[in-house]
Amino acid sequence: IIDDTINGAITTADNIVGRIGII
């Protein structure tokens, strides 16, 4: 469960960064 939560948070942050356009 912990791993899934961490992965989910990373994915969410990745999507936000992608939307902003910052690499």
Swiss-Prot record:
Keywords for the protein's UniProt record, in alphabetical order: Secreted
Tissue/organ expression: Expressed in skin glands.
Cellular component terms (Gene Ontology): extracellular region
Signal peptide: none
Superkingdom assignment: Eukaryota
Chief subcellular location: secreted
Cellular location(s): Secreted
Protein task: May act as an antimicrobial peptide.
Family per record: Belongs to the Frog skin active peptide (FSAP) family. Septenin subfamily.
Name by which UniProt lists this protein: Septenin 2d
Species of origin: Osteopilus septentrionalis
